[in-house]
Amino acid sequence: MSQVIDRIESRLNNNGLAFARKPLVIGGMAMEYYGMRKAGADIDLVISNEDYLALALKYPDKRKDIYGDLGVVLHEFEIWRSIALLDYDFLLKDAVSEGSLLVVSLDRLLFMRVCAMEVEKYKKDLLTMKEYYYEHFRNKMFLLEAETHTASYVKAGGTVFGGKYMDE
């Protein structure tokens, strides 16, 4: 199991936090889980509405509301029922199950960063994610083929018509 998951599960246990449905890891911890960058000190989770209602009832003075996104802030945790009013069920699509947690899918994480790209930190995350996608998902054979024509692309402004490469 991932060190990120171990760390989050340990902190949840130490704080006596338990949920009916698996919490969804988002934000910096998800970025670290995928190996894109180190997370900050906070741990962001999205939980089901039912779990949120129980948590909010237990910790009424720890509730937080950001433009209708309701959450509870406990220690290093920010635990939300939605992000940009996108709820647990929406963010759950293609999530990765790890122990007692779920990790938001790469595609949903990317979408969340796009939604917040006016914030400089998230704009940097988008650039990091773009490089991650290129490194992990580009067709390596196509990339090698394209690299043989780099000189032609430079001379032609990036586009070569009719297979007329000018590589020499």
Predicted regions and their residues:
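Compositionally biased terminal segments of proteins
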Residues: M1-E168
